[in-house]
C-alpha cells in the first residue's frame, strides 16, 4: 500500500433523498449536469449535480431490481436512458427537455444559485416539464441483465446477462422506438458482468464470471470474438476504456515533458485506447492492443504467457500493460477512468476508494539486438510510465460495500474550471459526491 498519498478525497455532498434499498450504479449524463442511479427498489432516480437533489424517479417499467443503466449519446432535444433489470428485460426511457442547454445547444452550468440551472430557471421545472416515457421493452435474455452500454454513435446497444450471453441491438431510429437484434454472442462460460464499447470504434469488451475479458467486432455483417484474455484469477467485475488523447502526468524529476508527451501520443496512435479491468482477485489491470506490425513479428513464440490476450480469430492481440498498485483487500467491483484527467479510481467490497495517477519516468532502453555491445549508440530513449495511488479513502460509505464509481464534471456553484467529482454508489442506498484535493 502507498505510504504517503499526495491527494485526499473530501465529501462534497450526498445526493438526496437516497434510496432506502441497495443502489448499484450511478451514470452521469454525457452532456447535462444530472446523473441516474439504479436501485434495488425497482426504480431509477435522476439527481441534479448543481444542487444534489432528486429531480425525477423513473418507475413502473421493471418487476425486479434495476441493476444497470446508460445514457444514449448524441441525442438532440431529449434524454434517452437504457435500463437493465434482474427481471431479464431492458427498458428504453425517453423524456423531452432542454434542461442545462443554451439555445445553440451548448452545455451550460448553473451559476447564480444552487436552484438555478445554466438557463437561469429553477431545476425543479425539470421534474415538472414532462414525465419519463417508457418507450420500449427489449426482451430476449433468460436471466438477470447485469450491464448495458451504448456504442459511440448511439446506434447500437449492448446488453449482457447472467444467462452467459451478450446481445447487440440496433436502434432503428424510425420514430416508433423499434430495435432490431443484430447479434447474440454466447462464448462466455459464466455470468457476463459488464459490457463496454470502445470510445470511437465499434469494438465491444465484455467481462465475466469465467475470469475472462473478451473483445468483439463485426466482420462482414457477423459479430464475433476477436480476442480473449485469461489474465485475471477471479471474476472480472467491470471494465472502462481510456479516453482519447490521454497523456500521463509528468513526474517532477522529468525535464522532458513535451518530448515525452509527443512520443507517447505517437505510440498510442498505433495501439489506440487501453482497457482497464478489475476483479475478484483484488487487482486492477490495464491492457493494450499490440499494433499490427508488432503482432506480425511476435506471432511465433507468444504462447505460455498468461497476460496475453490470444486472438481466437485473426484480428487482434492484446497484452497486459500494467498491474496497478495493489491497495484493495477484498473484491474490486468497479473502476472509472477519467476521460478528462486520465486519473483512474477503483472501489469494492472493502469500502475503499483508491485514486491512481500515471506518471512519466525516464530511463534508457536497449535496442532489440541483445548482441550489440554496450555503448551510447546502443541506447535509445523510450517513454516509460508508472502508476501510483495518490488518494486512499477508507470506509467511504461506513461499513457498506461500494458497488460503483464514476467521474463527472462538477456543476455546483463552487466548482473550478474543468473540475471533476467522483460519485460512489453503495449497498446502504447512498450516493456520495467527492472532490479530489491535491
Swiss-Prot record:
One of its GO terms (cellular component) is cytosolic [4Fe-4S] assembly targeting complex. The keyword Repeat applies. GO terms for biological process: iron-sulfur cluster assembly. Residues 290-311 are annotated as: Disordered. WD repeats lie at residues 15-57, 61-103, 140-179, 187-226, 254-297, 327-366, 396-438. It holds the Pfam family WD40. Residues 296-305 have a biased composition (Polar residues). Keywords: Repeat, WD repeat. InterPro entries: CIAO1/Cia1, G-protein_beta_WD-40_rep, WD40/YVTN_repeat-like_dom_sf, WD40_repeat_dom_sf, WD40_rpt. Essential component of the cytosolic iron-sulfur (Fe/S) protein assembly machinery. Required for the maturation of extramitochondrial Fe/S proteins. Belongs to the WD repeat CIA1 family. This is Probable cytosolic iron-sulfur protein assembly protein 1. It comes from Aspergillus oryzae (strain ATCC 42149 / RIB 40) (Yellow koji mold). The gene is cia1.
